[in-house]
Structures are given as structure tokens and as C-alpha cells.
UniProtKB/Swiss-Prot annotation:
Known role: Small subunit of the glutamine-dependent carbamoyl phosphate synthetase (CPSase). CPSase catalyzes the formation of carbamoyl phosphate from the ammonia moiety of glutamine, carbonate, and phosphate donated by ATP, constituting the first step of 2 biosynthetic pathways, one leading to arginine and/or urea and the other to pyrimidine nucleotides. The small subunit (glutamine amidotransferase) binds and cleaves glutamine to supply the large subunit with the substrate ammonia.
Start and end residues of each stretch annotated as CPSase: 1-207
Organism of origin: Bartonella tribocorum (strain CIP 105476 / IBS 506)
A matching Pfam family: CPSase_sm_chain
Name of the protein: Carbamoyl phosphate synthase small chain
Alphabetically ordered keywords of this record: Amino-acid biosynthesis, Arginine biosynthesis, ATP-binding, Glutamine amidotransferase, Ligase, Nucleotide-binding, Pyrimidine biosynthesis
């Protein structure tokens, strides 16, 4: 029997044109939008109210389906400027999206197309018209789910086959996905954040040189780094420490990215450890944070439901200050496995999980959350200044 999560819909659907099929056999039906087709992925939920374009194009969401808890998604349309993946024309990011309400006509002066058209162009399959908060409760109680999302305009689905695909999908554990999203070659970055009536700015002043290792980097991270008057060189994930050192960087940034950090660590750890040994200032975000922790000997674990949203409280254990931050991760650093020379600096006030570390006696630190937000609050923008201050102080000493 088909189990459904129903919702009061603002339209009449005689034949469902999209399905979400979970590995436990649950089938959820609704109206399709965006691309047609079938995709297997991990199902998670995001509690952000705004920034759906940035969320869906974040490479960290590779092989994931995002269930939005906020009911009205798509009201401001879409454009080609707010994409977070480094290569805008690529389809890096989520493979599926789930909305409670139908996609409306856009109402925003920056919109160039409606969300349905944008989803279709980016090959993202969408399901509309279900109770996304009931689905969120399911994820909260049972954990992230392996699932299949399918969209067929004629409403014909082979449900037994979809159930088998959901059950057989391998999941994200032991999966290195940086291969799919990293830059194919090195690039120089100079774009700064968007400003009212001016658009995106350009940084022409280079007081220091930062090499950013791209494990699936977001554009707004690079923009905020550029505001620190830094020359930024983005390099592919497999770039060796020898190649990075030959670029004579003043500091190295370890980016966010998708997949299991333990899988990516197989080739990332030797590079990171060599850079640490050379006493270079290092700053990591999200996956970069996890890779740094693995490099110093800690372990990472798969989370029950992950943290995905723009309203997460994080406590700085040194100052006692609480910041509201954006998060997007399904793995976490096990703080109990941190070695003695590594200090835990931040924790989540939702579940106490690790959110930051620093290596004692070295200019090296990282955070689990996203200080660049996009979308989200700006409480942690100062970390980019902190990183560059570390670099400048290190240059004075050395």
C-alpha cells in the first residue's frame, strides 16, 4: 500500500506527477516541477526562510534532496547571479528539492526567470504540494533517509522499481564527492560581494596571497576573502602541498564540500599535514574543518539528521559569545577524539556537537559552520578578518 504525507493543496491534482520514495518503502506523491527524471540521493531538511538559490547550488548538497520547511519557496524567482557553485553553468549542488506550496510567478526586480524554469535548466527535480514539516518530523525521528525522487509529466511510475532503487542506493558514507565538484584547473579570484545599485565589486588590491583548496567551494566565501585585499588562487582538490608551496602563499584556505570527509581525507591529509609542518596559516570551513580535524588525528561521525539551516546558535567557548550561523553538514568532528594539542573552540547549542577547533601554538583554525552565510546571518563575517590578521602577524614574526 502506498503511504502518503498529505497536505491541503492550492490546486487540484488528479494524477500525481512526482514521487518521493524512501528506502523504508514510504511513497509520497505530489506535483512535479523543474526537471523530469529520476535521482537517488540522501534526503535532508533545511530550515532557512530565504536563499533557496544559494542552497540548491551549494556543491556541499551534491547527491542530496533538500526538503524546505518554509512553505513558500520561489516567490522572488531566480537569476544567474546568486549561484554558489564556482562554475555557474555547471549543475553542481542538490539533485532534488521539495516544497509545500506550488511555485508562483516571481516578484523581484532581480529575477530573470521563475523557479520552475531555473530548476529545469539546472536539472533539479522538484516535488510540490506535500506537508514538508511532517516529512521533517520523519527525518528528525528516523534520521536522514536514502530516497528516490521522480518526476514524470504523465504520472506513470514503476513504484516497485523506485523502491528497489531507494533501498539499494549506497548513501554518502565512504563517498568522496569532491571529484565531482572541484575546479578542473587553478583560477584567480577577484570578485567581491554584491552591493546595492552596484552589483558585484572587484578587488584590485593584493596585500597578501591566499591559496584556496577547492573541495566544493562557495562563491561567497571567495568574495568575502577578497574583501580582505587578498590575491586568491583557487586550486583543485588534488593539488599537492609541493605545488601549493611553489605558489608561495601567505595562507591556505580549506573549503567546504560534499561527501564523507573520511573518504576525501585519503588524499587531503598528506597535503594538509605538510602545510601544517611548514607553519602556514590555515583556515577551514565545513568539510575543510573536518579534514583539518582528521589530519591532526581526530575522527568524524555521520550525524543522525545533520545540521542544515540559517538559524543555528553556536557558542564560542573562549569568549562565551553566542553567534547565529548558517550550517550545512551531515558529518561532524568527534570532539572526544581531538588530541591534546588541539583545542575545541566552538560548540552547537542545539546538540553540543563540535563546531570549531584550533591547533595550539600554530596559526591554524577551522569552523564547522558557514561564516560567509549566503544565505544567513552575518554574525561570523569577522572570521575572514581574523584569518587575514593571523597571516599578517605571522608574516611579521617570520
Amino acid at each position: 500500500m502506498i503511504q502518503t504525507i498529505s497536505s491541503s493543496r492550492p490546486w487540484s491534482v488528479n494524477t500525481p506527477t512526482a514521487l518521493l520514495v524512501l528506502a523504508d518503502g514510504t511513497v509520497i506523491e505530489g506535483k512535479g516541477a523543474g526537471a523530469t527524471g529520476i535521482a537517488e540521493a540522501e534526503l535532508c531538511f533545511n530550515t532557512a526562510i530565504t536563499g533557496y538559490e544559494e542552497i540548491l547550488t551549494d556543491p556541499s548538497y551534491t547527491q542530496q534532496i533538500v526538503n524546505f520547511t518554509f512553505p513558500h519557496i520561489g516567490n522572488v524567482g531566480a537569476n544567474s547571479e546568486d549561484i554558489e557553485s564556482l562554475t555557474p553553468l555547471s549543475c553542481h549542488g542538490a539533485v532534488g528539492a521539495i516544497f509545500k506550496a506550488d511555485i508562483t510567478h516571481p516578484s523581484n526586480y532581480r529575477a530573470s526567470e521563475n523557479l520552475h524554469q531555473w530548476l529545469k535548466a539546472r536539472k533539479i527535480i522538484a516535488l510540490c504540494g506535500i506537508d514538508t514539516r511532517a516529512l521533517t518530523i520523519l527525518i528528525r525521528e528516523k534520521g536522514t533517509q536514502n530516497a528516490v525522487i521522480a518526476h514524470n509529466s504523465d504520472g506513470n511510475f514503476d513504484i516497485p522499481s523506485l523502491k528497489k532503487r531507494a533501498q539499494k542506493w549506497h548513501g554518502l558514507v565512504n563517498l568522496d564527492l569532491t571529484e565531482e565538484v572541484t575546479s578542473p584547473s587553478s583560477i584567480e579570484w577577484d570578485e567581491e560581494p554584491w552591493c546595492w545599485n552596484k552589483g558585484y565589486g572587484t578587488n584590485n588590491v593584493h596585500n597578501l596571497h591566499i591559496v584556496a583548496i577547492d573541495y566544493g567551494i562557495k562563491r561567497n566565501i571567495l568574495r568575502l576573502m577578497a574583501t580582505q585585499k587578498a590575491r586568491i588562487t583557487v586550486v583543485p582538490a588534488h593539488t599537492t602541498a609541493k605545488e601549493i608551496l611553489a605558489m608561495t602563499p601567505d595562507g591556505v584556505f580549506l573549503s567546504n564540500g560534499p561527501g564523507d570527509p573520511a573518504a576525501t581525507a585519503q588524499y587531503a591529509i598528506p597535503t594538509i599535514n605538510t602545510l601544517i609542518d611548514h607553519n602556514l596559516p590555515i583556515f577551514g570551513i565545513c568539510l575543510g574543518h573536518q579534514l583539518l580535524a582528521l589530519a591532526v588525528g581526530a575522527k568524524t561521525v555521520k550525524m543522525h539528521q545533520g545540521h542544515h539551516g540559517a538559524n543555528h546558535p553556536v557558542k564560542d567557548l573562549n569568549s562565551g559569545k553566542v553567534e547565529i550561523v548558517s550550517m550545512n553538514h551531515g558529518f561532524a568532528v568527534d570532539a572526544a577524539t581531538l588530541p591534546k594539542h588541539v583545542q575545541e573552540t566552538h560548540i552547537s547549542l542545539f546538540d553540543g556537537s563540535n563546531c570549531g577547533i584550533r591547533i595550539i601554538g600554530k596559526p591554524v583554525f577551522s569552523v564547522q559552520y558557514h561564516p560567509e552565510a549566503s544565505p544567513g546571518p552575518q554574525d561570523s563575517h569577522y572570521l575572514f578578518q581574523h584569518f587575514c590578521d593571523l597571516i599578517m602577524n605571522h608574516k611579521k614574526i617570520s
